[in-house]
C-alpha cells in the first residue's frame, strides 16, 4: 500500500509550523505537492511560513492552535477538513518547547506543567483527534510525532523535557501497534541537536543555553535535512527516525546495556560540570 511517494500530493496538517522543524516540514511537504495547514500558537509566525510556501507556488493556510487545549485541536481538525474537503493524509504533531538547567526538585512545577502541556498533551490531543479521522477514511496516511533523542537519553537537568519526550515515544509506539494492519503509518522523530530556535525560546538557564548552543552549532543538522529523512522514513513505513549517528548509538547502548548507559550519562554530566565550572 505504501510506496516511496506516500508523502506527496496529499493534505498535511502540522502543529508548531511557525518556525524550526515545523516550518521545515511545512515547506518540504508543500514542495512535495501537498496542501498544507500550518498551525502555531503564534498565528503570525504560521503565516510567515505560509508566505514562504506561497512564494514557491505552494498551497497553504495558517491558523492559530494551542495544542495544549483540546478545543483548539478539534477546531484545527475541522478547519483542515473543510479546506481539504476531506481528511488529511498526514498529521505532524510537532509543537514543542524546551526546559532545562535545573535538577529535579528545583524545576518549578509551573515549568513541568507548561512542558507536559505542550510536549506531551499536544501529541496526545493530536493523536486523539486525528486518529479516528484517518481510521474512518481508510486510506493510506501517516502520523508523525516529533520526540527527541532526549526520550531515551536521560540527560541530567532536563527532566521535564526528557519525560515529555519519553512519553511521546511511548505514545507513538503504542499507536503504531494499535494501527498495525491498517493503512496508517506512524513515525516518531528522535533527533539530537537540530539548528532551530527552541533553545533560545524555551525556559532554560543561561549556563545550559550556552552549552546547548555550542553543541547545536557544532553537531546540529539543518531542520530541512532532518525533515526529509523523517518523511522518507514514514514513506517506507518506518516507526523510528533517528537522523544522527549519535542518536542511533545512544539508542543501541541504552537498549542493550541500560544501567551502564545511565551511569555513563551521570559520569559524563559530572565531568562536564567540572570542566565548565
Language-model features and meaning:
Residues 127, 164:
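Active-site helix of classical SDR
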Residues 181-245:
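SDR active-site lid
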Residues 102-104, 108-114:
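Substrate-binding pocket helix/loop in short-chain dehydrogenase/reductase
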Residues 11, 18-19:
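Conserved glycine-rich cofactor-binding loop
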Residues 148:
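Residue(s) in the substrate-gating loop at a strand-loop-helix junction
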Amino acid at each position: 500500500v505504501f510506496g516511496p511517494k506516500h508523502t506527496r500530493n496529499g493534505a498535511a496538517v502540522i502543529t508548531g509550523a511557525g518556525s524550526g522543524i515545523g516550518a521545515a516540514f511545512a515547506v518540504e511537504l508543500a514542495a512535495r505537492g501537498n496542501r498544507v495547514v500550518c498551525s502555531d500558537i503564534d498565528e503570525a509566525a504560521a503565516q510567515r511560513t505560509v508566505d514562504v510556501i506561497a512564494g514557491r507556488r505552494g498551497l497553504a493556510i495558517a491558523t492559530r492552535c494551542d495544542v495544549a487545549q483540546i478545543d483548539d485541536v478539534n477546531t484545527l481538525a475541522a478547519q483542515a477538513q473543510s479546506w481539504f474537503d476531506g481528511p488529511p493524509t498526514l498529521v505532524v504533531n510537532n509543537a514543542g518547547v524546551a526546559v532545562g538547567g535545573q535538577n529535579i526538585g528545583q524545576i518549578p512545577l509551573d515549568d513541568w506543567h507548561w512542558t507536559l502541556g505542550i510536549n506531551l498533551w499536544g501529541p496526545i490531543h493530536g493523536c486523539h483527534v486525528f486518529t479516528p479521522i484517518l481510521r474512518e477514511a481508510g486510506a493510506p496516511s501517516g502520523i508523525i510525532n516529533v520526540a527527541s533523542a532526549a526520550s531515551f537519553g536521560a540527560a541530567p537537568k532536563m527532566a521535564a523535557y526528557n519525560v515529555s519526550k519519553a512519553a511521546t515515544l511511548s505514545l507513538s509506539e503504542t499507536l503504531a501497534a494499535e494501527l498495525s494492519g491498517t493503512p496508517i503509518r506512524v513515525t516518531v522523530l528522535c533527533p539530537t541537536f537540530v539548528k532551530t530556535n527552541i533553545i533560545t525560546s524555551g525556559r532554560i538557564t543561561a549556563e545550559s543555553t550556552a552549552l546547548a548552543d555550542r553543541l547545536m552549532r557544532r553537531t546540529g543538522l539543518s531542520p530541512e535535512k532532518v525533515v526529509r529523512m523523517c518523511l522518507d522514513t514514514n514513506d517506507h513505513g518506518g516507526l523510528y527516525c533517528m537522523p544522527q549517528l549519535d542518536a542511533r548509538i545512544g539508542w543501541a547502548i541504552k537498549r542493550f546495556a541500560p544501567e551502564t548507559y545511565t551511569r555513563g550519562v551521570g559520569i559524563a554530566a559530572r565531568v562536564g560540570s567540572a570542566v565548565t565550572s
